[in-house]
């Protein structure tokens, strides 16, 4: 492809890119803003050091965060060097160090043909360990796996008992980590965390191996440097020799994975630590000026950054202001997003809807379906396919139709009631020999006193609960029914009682989704109608479409770009999230602001920001303020079109309050807000 050949014509690089690529020796940090051509710089750098500085390409490490990026570099470099390189040193951290580990496996008591376990296998293994340690079944396998993963990322070994206990409050975590690790060695296997931690152990405990490797490696290139964690950064430093040929490309303003262990300090402190210069790439080839100025003015409110300002170098895209809309309710906001897309939609242009919380997706999905617009969710399941939603729906389905065996199996022991495989087998065998559904079979066993007292005490509350829900179906609103199931089943408590920090964050999102399920229920009169709606929504999505609208969280949007971008829900408590507001630390707020920067810079020319002044959650109307990030955008780049609706357009559904939208409370607050913040 033309682009690849160009990547080596140095005269096609802009001035800053060229300075970076032609850097001679020693460390360099390239601060590459959104859309400034960092892949081209990395590739050109690789080719430049081979062709011009005469480095051997087998002795260059190029680390990326995805296989896709690694393949892109290989492909472009192969083209430019006209020569097919199969270097073990180009790839992700995990692929590079897995090869290293196979060579030196015996240093950590493994054989070189060790297996890398996927998450299913890891779960099976930890389950054995938890049973062996007699840990209460209430705590799930993945909590322990996550915690062990975190310990590994923090360079804490199973034998560092005091460090483990200082870091984690999980019951018996020190013993479990230890036994889990022994089991891995016994079955000649590693998990993802081991690939890096074992390599770190080998390099720090065997001076000869470390020296051999650091002398062999002539140059190291790192992509997405702002996403590195402690362990990854330390591994790289162990492979550096005295020339310190380290070329890091990254953007501190796009560091949004702190919750996964990424350390923004790595990139912020790099220039001091290595006493080196910083090349800033600021010419952006993606977005128009209004968008870049907005992104720059928002992110400039962060104190902890190295600093740079982007400027637009794409003459082919229209200059237009950012569209700002305020709505009375989330319902109205979602309807507008779908309606606006349906007016602009065509096969040539791309559309992205980026939300802060997954719970925002449900009402948007709903409206996209109403408008028959093709969409897909990137980086996660659709709303009604999410685990927590399917779990709670299974209660409703079983209560609605007691012969629904699939739902019965899904929830009989969820939340855990101590009803194990054996007990479930008794119920199923009885159902087969008596031609009953699973739930009828359980009721039959209970009525005829055929269950052991201990099993009976565990299953009776479940029978009572399902009967109670069945009874309520025709007596109460669906909204109240949903709340009843979520609370009385113990499902909400199970999510709230989480001990593990990472899981807590995930569970907050699950709880938001359950509240959103209650909102969805409140829009229907009866349960059958609602369940049919769910079936149709899921069916509707099986058909794929060439140019579908992409719906995703801001985290999943990193690295993507769209002609048209919609950023709904810019309200305090949603964005910045309530979690960040509760922590009330500069650190968590700055991370949210970086997310805003990532969101804004995904758009080429059409950017639509919106917020609702009230959101209906869990039966209550919550009023909220516009996000502080809106007031950080200079008003010169914004156009508030909240009250300009296409009133004369009769064939589109009217917005609920289109008649009085000019005077809606949201509108009034927006005006006050904008007047107050006129820059």
Predicted feature descriptions by range:
Residues 2-112, 116, 211, 293-296:
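P-loop NTPase Walker
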Residues 11-22, 26-30, 41, 61-62, ...:
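Conserved helicase NTPase motor core
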Residues 26, 55-59, 85-87, 121, ...:
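Short glycine-/polar-rich loops that comprise or flank the Walker A/P-loop
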């Amino acid at each position: 492809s033309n682009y690849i050949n160009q990547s080596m014509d140095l005269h096609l690089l802009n001035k800053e890119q060229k300075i970076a690529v032609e850097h001679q020796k020693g460390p360099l940090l390239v601060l590459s803003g959104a859309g400034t051509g960092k892949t081209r710089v990395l590739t050109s750098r690789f080719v430049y050091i081979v062709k011009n500085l005469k480095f051997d390409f087998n002795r260059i490490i190029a680390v990326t965060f995805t296989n896709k990026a690694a393949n892109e570099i290989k492909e472009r470099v192969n083209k430019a060097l006209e020569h097919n390189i199969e270097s073990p040193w180009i790839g992700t951290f995990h692929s590079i160090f897995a090869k290293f580990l196979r060579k030196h496996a015996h240093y950590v008591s493994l054989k070189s043909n060790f297996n890398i376990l996927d998450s299913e296998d890891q779960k099976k293994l930890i389950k054995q360990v938890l049973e062996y340690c007699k840990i209460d079944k209430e705590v799930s396998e993945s909590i322990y796996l996550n915690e062990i993963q975190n310990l590994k990322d923090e360079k804490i070994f199973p034998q560092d008992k005091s460090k483990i206990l200082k870091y984690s409050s999980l019951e018996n975590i020190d013993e479990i980590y230890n036994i889990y690790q022994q089991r891995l060695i016994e079955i000649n296997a590693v998990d993802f965390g081991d690939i890096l931690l074992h390599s770190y152990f080998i390099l720090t405990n065997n001076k000869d191996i470390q020296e051999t490797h650091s002398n062999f490696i002539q140059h190291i290139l790192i992509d997405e440097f702002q996403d590195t964690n402690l362990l990854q950064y330390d591994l790289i430093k162990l492979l550096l020799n005295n020339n310190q040929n380290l070329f890091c490309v990254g953007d501190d303003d796009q560091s949004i994975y702190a919750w996964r262990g990424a350390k923004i300090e790595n990139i912020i402190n790099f220039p001091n630590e290595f006493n080196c210069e910083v090349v800033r790439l600021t010419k952006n080839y993606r977005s128009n000026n209004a968008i870049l100025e907005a992104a720059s003015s928002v992110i400039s409110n962060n104190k902890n950054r190295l600093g740079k300002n982007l400027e637009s170098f794409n003459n082919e895209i229209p200059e237009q202001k950012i569209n700002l809309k305020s709505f009375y309710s989330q319902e109205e906001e979602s309807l507008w997003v779908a309606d606006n897309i349906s007016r602009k939609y065509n096969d040539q242009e791309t559309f992205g809807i980026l939300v802060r919380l997954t719970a925002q997706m449900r009402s948007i999905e709903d409206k996209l379906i109403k408008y028959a617009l093709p969409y897909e969710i990137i980086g996660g399941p659709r709303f009604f396919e999410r685990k927590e939603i399917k779990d709670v729906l299974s209660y409703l389905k079983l209560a609605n139709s007691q012969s629904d065996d699939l739902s019965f199996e899904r929830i009989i022991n969820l939340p855990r009631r101590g009803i194990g495989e054996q007990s479930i087998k008794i119920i199923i065998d009885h159902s087969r020999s008596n031609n009953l559904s699973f739930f009828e079979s359980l009721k039959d066993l209970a009525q005829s006193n055929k269950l052991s007292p201990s099993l009976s005490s565990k299953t009776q509350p479940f029978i009572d609960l399902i009967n109670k829900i069945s009874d309520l179906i025709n007596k109460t609103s669906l909204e109240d029914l949903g709340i009843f199931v979520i609370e009385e089943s113990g499902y909400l408590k199970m999510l709230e009682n989480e001990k593990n920090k990472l899981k807590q964050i995930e569970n907050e999102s699950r709880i938001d989704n359950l509240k959103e399920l209650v909102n969805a229920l409140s829009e229907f009169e009866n349960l059958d109608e609602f369940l049919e709606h769910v079936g149709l929504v899921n069916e509707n999505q099986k058909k794929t479409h060439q140019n579908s609208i992409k719906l995703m969280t801001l985290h999943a949007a990193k690295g993507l770009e769209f002609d048209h971008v919609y950023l709904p829900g810019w309200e305090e408590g949603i964005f910045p999230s309530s979690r960040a507001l509760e922590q009330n630390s500069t650190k968590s707020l700055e991370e949210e602001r970086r997310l805003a920067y990532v969101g804004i810079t995904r758009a080429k020319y059409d950017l639509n920001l919106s917020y609702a002044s009230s959101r209906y959650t869990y039966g209550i109307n919550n009023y909220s303020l516009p996000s502080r990030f809106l007031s950080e955008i200079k008003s010169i780049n914004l156009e508030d079109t909240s009250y300009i609706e296409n009133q004369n357009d009769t064939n589109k559904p009217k917005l609920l309050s289109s008649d009085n939208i000019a005077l809606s409370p949201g509108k009034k607050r927006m005006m006050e807000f904008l007047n107050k913040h006129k820059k």
